[in-house]
């Protein structure tokens, strides 16, 4: 897994070794960001169920102003911090080790784009939308 474009282009990202998490494939991520390419710059991003943080990091690399990362898994939080450090983007990030409901209640600014990719096994897709 890697950052596809922008300031951190080519940066290799770590992912979680877990059966409950599955990273978004690079080709899927690339397609998403091709659609969003003109809507990322200077935006505030919320990456819920962030896992490795790859979606929020890609957005920051492409010019997003700030990204909030939310995951309840301790290993995910550790990996997100590592990946932000590796991509030199940690100063634009806020990380919540909380449930998505708790994290949303702590936000004090307008969010422009939300990435929502929960593990299907949790059964929260409908509720989290």
Where are these regions (language model features)?
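Class I S-adenosyl-L-methionine-dependent methyltransferase catalytic core
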Residues: 1-129
């Amino acid at each position: 897994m890697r950052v596809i474009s922008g300031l951190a282009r080519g940066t290799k990202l770590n992912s979680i070794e877990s059966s409950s998490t599955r990273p978004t494939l690079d080709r899927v991520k690339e397609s998403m960001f091709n659609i969003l390419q003109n809507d990322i710059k200077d935006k505030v991003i919320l990456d819920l169920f962030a896992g490795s943080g790859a979606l929020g990091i890609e957005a920051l690399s492409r010019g997003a102003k700030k990204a909030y990362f939310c995951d309840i898994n301790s290993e995910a939080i550790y990996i997100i911090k590592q990946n932000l450090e590796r991509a030199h983007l940690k100063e634009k990030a806020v990380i919540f080790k909380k449930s998505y409901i708790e994290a949303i209640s702590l936000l004090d600014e307008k969010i422009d784009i939300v990435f929502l990719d929960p593990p299907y096994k949790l059964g929260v897709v409908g509720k989290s939308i």
